[in-house]
Amino acid sequence: MAEYLIPKSAVVFEEEIKKSRFITYLQHTEGLEQAKAFWAEIKALHPNARHHCWAAVAGRPTDSQQLGFSDDGEPAGTAGKPMLSALQGSQVGEISAVVVRYYGGILLGTGGLVRAYGNGVQQALKLLETERKVERQLFQVHCDYAQLNWIQILCEQHQIEIYQQDFQVQ
């Protein structure tokens, strides 16, 4: 059984850097489709913002097929990538970050953007409450009634949860 941390509740962190307003949202998302839906939800919430950058570790923290990010118009590699790096460093799975930027008229440069987006996610992660997720698999076992006690003992020894029992005659 694999287990890892996931967000328990959503987080919002806001800061101003050189007159630009950065609002970071973190939320539990299971899969990239939910991550993209979360991004669309935040984008609709802030239609006048200049950028809506996102990053997601949408599965287990070690599952590279469930990663995604977007710079949403910022110079390539200055927003989504540092956001994703911060998420991966947290070892939290099933998490998405969206950072909304209201441009304040002062250019931050590529280094400034990398720091602003990455740090926003890091600060939000410090506020994040997590809970442990245990991945489980469902199995169906058919046996004679005479074998039932042996199977129950085996399940107990290996911490296997019996979800349902059906005693039908076959």
Describe the role of every protein-language-model region.
Residues M1-G77, Q165:
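C-terminal regulatory domains involved in ligand/effector binding and gene-expression control
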Residues H51-C53, L128-Q137, Y163-Q165:
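Flexible, glycine/charged-enriched surface loops at secondary-structure junctions
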Residues H142-I162:
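Short amphipathic alpha-helix segments
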